[in-house]
Regions:
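Redox-cofactor binding/interface segments in oxidoreductases and associated redox assembly factors
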Residues: 75, 81-82, 146
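Rossmann-fold dinucleotide-binding core
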Residues: 141-143, 147-213
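NAD(P)-binding Rossmann-fold cofactor-contacting core
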Residues: 28-54
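Short acidic low-complexity segments
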Residues: 63-76
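Long, compositionally biased stretches enriched for glycine and/or charged residues
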Residues: 185-486
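Short, surface-exposed basic-aromatic patches at helix termini and helix-loop junctions that form
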Residues: 52-57, 82, 136, 156-166, ...
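N-terminal Rossmann-like dinucleotide-binding module
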Residues: 5-34
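Rossmann-fold NAD(P)-binding glycine/threonine-rich loop
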Residues: 90-160
Length: 487
């Protein structure tokens, strides 16, 4: 069996290596072609070196092609696995830090809220370039498996405007299912679970064990759980008020809705600072900053570690390898993917990206009809979908009016800021992110003139209600070494 898979964003060592290892764990895939591409040649070469070492040690005769030329990597590829972060750490910092000046306190800022909307402008602009290359040089009908956030926006733009079949993938549903298994005391493989909604706002609308409906037991189970009751306060409150548990982590979910992060003095009531993902202000940004020199400090140590076994024993639960395996071998796989709705969830807009159960085999990807979401869940998702639609259309057409309307309609942004503040904030973010936003050339010129010449709304020297100190490189290294010793 021979075909080609291209990884873009392959300089992201841990995630790219995980996906690569998963794919090569399929015995039939030991003669396929693999190409890695990234804009950072040093990180790209390190990832190639490590993955090639794993191949050689397992006597698999694949030679990885690594190139900074995207089109060369995409040439004749049947599958493109995308895990890029457009703007890197520099762009990410502006997604979090500028909104804080206006009182918007985000934990992550990569999916919705002001940070996610602006991240979407950068990602969509570049991913449409990816799509052009895929159409021109990849195998006809090539599929892009997208891990980049904001996942729904990027997947929507690539399908509608990029004209490349794009499947959005996320692991939130997998983690939530593990939590439900623990709360119920039932092995995960014995649970029959259906999730439906939109990326990072998907709901466990059916949880059954031997035919018994387990959803009525979830609230009491989560409230009684010693760990989850402290770490998942937003998710539990949403479960209490909407009747269904959400797939997304506490910190992520808290910034997608209007209620939990709008008053600084109440934010700590809803979060937990034991782990950044539970709601820390700028938590993911802090961790990313702390790990920014990771390649230089840890790569030699990783090279000294035992090679990965490519026999399937270390295969993760990430969907990408199972999708490719099923399409190529005919084996069956069921997972929850992000796809164009087109009537799958009947009370969400036809033109939107939804996250739903899908079945994969040699005949393709089959998408069963979910029907209506519970009305309250649909209402939450619908508001986010309209933000996504405005943001997608803004990014594709460089329409600054739609961009600012997307920010106005965003639940948390609208709960904290008034329209003039939103207008000024978006102008400031456009100027700060100019290098990644070629579609906004004229709007950025106008924003610069406004910020330089017009009376400005005063902003705050505000660093968030739940911000932790960034650790030094030495502290990070010591903690990592301590974890290895403990393990």
């Amino acid at each position: 069996m021979s075909f080609k898979i291209a990884f873009i964003g392959a300089g992201s060592l841990v995630f790219a290596r995980t996906l690569f290892t998963d794919i090569i764990s399929v015995p039939e895939f030991h003669n396929i072609e693999i190409a890695f591409t990234d804009i950072n040649p040093d990180n790209l070469e390190k990832t190639r070196e490590l993955c090639q070492r794993d191949l050689d040690a397992n006597n698999i005769p694949i030679r990885i092609e690594a190139t900074t030329n995207r089109r060369d990597a995409f040439k004749d590829a049947r599958y493109i696995v995308n895990c890029v972060r457009i703007g890197g750490l520099e762009g990410f910092e502006t997604d979090v830090e500028i909104p804080l000046k206006y009182g918007i306190d985000q934990c992550v800022g990569d999916t919705l809220c002001t940070g996610g909307i602006m991240y979407g402008q950068r990602v969509i602009a570049e991913m449409l370039n990816f799509c052009k290359d895929i159409r021109e040089v990849s195998e006809p009908g090539a599929i892009m498996l997208n891990y980049s956030n904001p996942n729904a926006m990027a997947t929507w733009a690539c399908n509608k405007y990029g004209k490349v079949r794009t499947i959005g993938l996320c692991h939130g549903e997998i983690h939530g299912e593990q939590q439900i298994s623990e709360v119920l005391g039932i092995p995960r493989e014995e649970l029959d679970v259906i999730c439906a909604g939109i990326n990072h706002q998907t709901w466990y609308i059916s949880v059954k064990h031997n035919g018994e409906d387990m959803i009525p037991k979830l609230l009491a189970g989560f409230e009684a759980h010693p760990k989850f009751s402290q770490e998942e306060k937003v998710r539990i409150d949403m479960l209490k008020r909407f009747g269904y548990y959400s797939t997304e982590s506490n910190g992520h979910l808290s910034e997608y809705v209007a209620w939990y992060r709008k008053r600084p003095d109440e934010i700590k009531d809803w979060i937990n600072l034991d782990n950044w993902i539970n709601g820390e202000t700028g938590g993911y940004l802090r961790v990313t900053r702390e790990e920014r020199n990771w390649f230089e400090t840890d790569f030699p140590k990783i090279l000294a570690e035992p090679v990965k076994k490519l026999d399937g024993s270390e295969r993760s639960k990430e969907h990408a390898s199972y999708i490719i395996e099923s399409l190529e071998t005919g084996r069956h796989y069921r997972g929850h993917f992000n796809i164009m709705n087109e009537g799958c969830i009947t009370n969400l807009p036809w033109e939107s990206v939804v996250e739903v159960p899908c079945y994969v085999d040699g005949n393709g990807i089959s998408i069963p009809k979910v029907g209506d979401l519970p009305l309250g869940c649909a209402a939450v998702c619908s508001q986010s979908i309209w933000v996504q639609k405005l943001a997608v259309e803004a990014a594709v057409h460089g329409d600054v009016q739609l961009l600012k309307q997307a920010a106005m309609m965003d639940p948390l942004t609208g709960a904290v800021c008034n329209p003039p503040e939103i207008w000024q904030m978006i102008d400031e973010m456009l100027v700060a992110q100019e290098q990644w936003l070629p579609q906004y050339t004229e709007a950025i010129k106008a924003a610069k003139e406004h910020l330089a010449n017009d009376p400005l709304i005063p902003t705050k020297d505000y660093h968030g209600a739940a911000r932790l100190r960034e650790k030094t490189p030495e502290e990070v290294a010591a903690e990592r070494d301590a974890r290895k010793i403990t393990a």
